[in-house]
């Protein structure tokens, strides 16, 4: 009877060890998880007026950045002509859209653990009298918990950007209250 009991104990231990290895193999090794985000642009009906005062389409360029300091120090033409040279290692990603007057457009990103801010440039006809540049801090990457099999992905956060007649402005953030 003792021999059967010992065999049973070894089988249970082997099953527990196998389960631990399977769960460990499925676990994520990442210590931080990027927070996905969306940028909702809403163009004013009178955006980017031409010489006759008529609204015109406007090009928007979004730069995903490690930090905003280098972006803030560059001029419009350096950012538009060669962003990689102007921003160097600070630049992680770029997106471009063209908004019609009154149009709303959403850009979605999975997030990046290295990203700390986004820089937004609007190609206004009158750069001198417009706020053509805007920086928005991004949510920090979330630390993972020790129970990797119980890990939830962070919820998407949305920033609303108004593309006004002569400038860019943050009008709000949608941060979900539910943690998963």
Task: Label every PLM stretch briefly.
Residues 2-14:
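Bacterial N-terminal signal peptides that target proteins for export
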Residues 22-25:
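C-terminal motif of bacterial Sec signal peptides marking the signal peptidase cleavage site
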Residues 133-180:
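Glycine-rich, aromatic-bearing surface loops/beta-hairpins
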């Amino acid at each position: 009877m003792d021999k059967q009991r010992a065999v049973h104990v070894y089988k249970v231990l082997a099953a527990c060890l196998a389960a631990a290895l399977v769960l460990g193999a499925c676990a994520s090794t990442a210590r931080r998880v990027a927070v996905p985000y969306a940028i909702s642009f809403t163009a004013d009906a009178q955006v980017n007026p031409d010489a006759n005062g008529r609204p015109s389409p406007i090009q928007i360029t979004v730069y995903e950045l490690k930090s905003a300091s280098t972006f803030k120090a560059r001029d419009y033409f350096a950012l538009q002509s060669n962003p990689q040279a102007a921003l160097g290692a600070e630049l992680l990603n770029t997106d471009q859209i063209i908004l019609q007057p009154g149009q709303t457009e959403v850009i979605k990103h999975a997030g990046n653990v290295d990203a700390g801010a986004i820089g937004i440039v609007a190609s206004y006809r009158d750069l001198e009298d417009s706020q053509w540049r805007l920086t928005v801090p991004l949510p920090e990457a979330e630390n993972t918990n020790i129970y990797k099999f119980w890990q939830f992905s962070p919820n998407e956060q949305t920033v609303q950007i108004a593309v006004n007649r002569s400038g860019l402005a943050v009008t709000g953030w949608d941060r979900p209250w539910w943690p998963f």
